[in-house]
Amino acid sequence: MGCTRGWRLLLLLGLVCVGALQGRGQEESREVSLQYNPGSSDTSVNVVHVRAVGNGSTIHYVWSTIGTPTVLLIFTHSETSQLQVNWTKLLSPAPQGALRIEPAESVSYATALLFTRIFEYQDVNNTANFSGTDEKYFYPAYNLSDFLWDSANATINATSLSANLTGYNASDPTDSFHNGSVSFRISAYSSSGRDSSSPRLRHTANCTKLEFLVAGVRPRGNNSRFALEMVTIEKEGRKKMESVHSIDDEYTPTIFEMMQLVPDAPNSSHARGFLQWKSVAYGSPSGTRADILPCQLHPLRPFNTTFPAGSIAHAYFGDDLADAYKLEAFNISFGIADGDFYDKNRFLSWSALIGYGEPPRDSFSILVICIMAVALGTPLLLLIVGTLVVTALRHKVYSNYEPIN
């Protein structure tokens, strides 16, 4: 009886492991292309178009540093939908309607994320309490719409599906950007997998990665910390924050939390866009455990500030952007109480995924699955072998028994 039960448990464990490994190979893939300034040879402005085709649909990601740095996510239920750009209108003071998807009726969902400001504050007590810091300790915020941006043309890599958007605050009177910059590194994916660089985010073909970098910028104080302000756009309903916890910290030691920003639309008949990240940033390019900087998400709030009308959000959504859509702002601050300040390495890196559908779920690696299988399977195997040995010995004893007359 015990032997049969042990075999069943061992068989069940094997099926679970095989199922977990097979499940990794059944995830969808897309044909992904990356194009710089489609339809224009002008390299003084940046529009990067990522087109991901497959499964009867197309996901368009449009990144740009025109006006406020922005990424558009547009989902269509057609594999032939195309981005059309009216460059004359896009570069004019009234860009509304300069970006569109053809055929227009194929669009089933569109959203945008704008990167508006970088805050720098003096953490005099080393508490990393961004929201609780008095206003007098804040330096003037960096408005990213005022930055000058390098041409991304030389950074476009059609093979690795990546590009860099790098900018400087040329009007800063403190000359903090003399040897420094702010960058957005873009990476697209044609299939599921996991990044090789920290924080080793798990991705699917339905998302792209954003890496926000502050490198070499001279802080305006010895105990400076930073925060990034972003604005989301949603037509139906608002956004909501979700915290997803895991028991596994294999890829990001000591970090067990994944944060997600998703639409709060429980009655929606179709999927929506998402922003997902681990609650961690890094204070060094090496991205090791010693470089970890926990990051904190601050509550969503209505965005009532008028941002420059030159962004691609205006170019796509049009004049009714503020009236017909929900605009919400939120901040992510970087640092931990009693931790190192930015000035130590003058480097900050934070990564997130922007995508459509269900956010990727973190999972155990094949190595961990094998270790678990060995750890759980070995005792079962020993139990089975032990049961067989004991049964065999008992049978031998009984077979050699000779009754005494």
From Swiss-Prot:
Keywords for this entry?
A: Glycoprotein, Lysosome, Membrane, Signal, Transmembrane, Transmembrane helix
Q: Name one GO cellular component term.
A: lysosomal membrane
What residue stretch is flagged as signal peptide? Answer: 1-25
Motif mapping: Lysosomal targeting motif: 401-405
Q: Which residues lie on this side of the membrane: Cytoplasmic?
A: 387-405
Spans through the membrane: 366-386
Q: What is its main location?
A: membrane
Glycosylated sites: 55, 86, 125, 129, 143, 153, 157, 164, 169, 179, 206, 222, 267, 304, 331
| Cellular localization per UniProt | Lysosome membrane
State the membrane topology. Single-pass type I membrane protein
Which intervals lie on the Lumenal side per UniProt? 26-365
Instruction: Tell me the InterPro entries matching this sequence.
Output: NCU-G1
One GO BP: protein localization to lysosome
Has the keyword Transmembrane been applied to this entry?
A: yes
The function of this protein is:
Required to protect lysosomal transporter MFSD1 from lysosomal proteolysis and for MFSD1 lysosomal localization.
Q: Please describe the quaternary structure of this protein.
A: Interacts (via lumenal domain) with lysosomal protein MFSD1; the interaction starts while both proteins are still in the endoplasmic reticulum and is required for stabilization of MFSD1 in lysosomes but has no direct effect on its targeting to lysosomes or transporter activity.
As for family, the record states:
Belongs to the GLMP family.
The record's section on PANTHER family has:
GLYCOSYLATED LYSOSOMAL MEMBRANE PROTEIN
- Protein name per UniProt: Glycosylated lysosomal membrane protein A
UniProt lists the gene as glmp-a
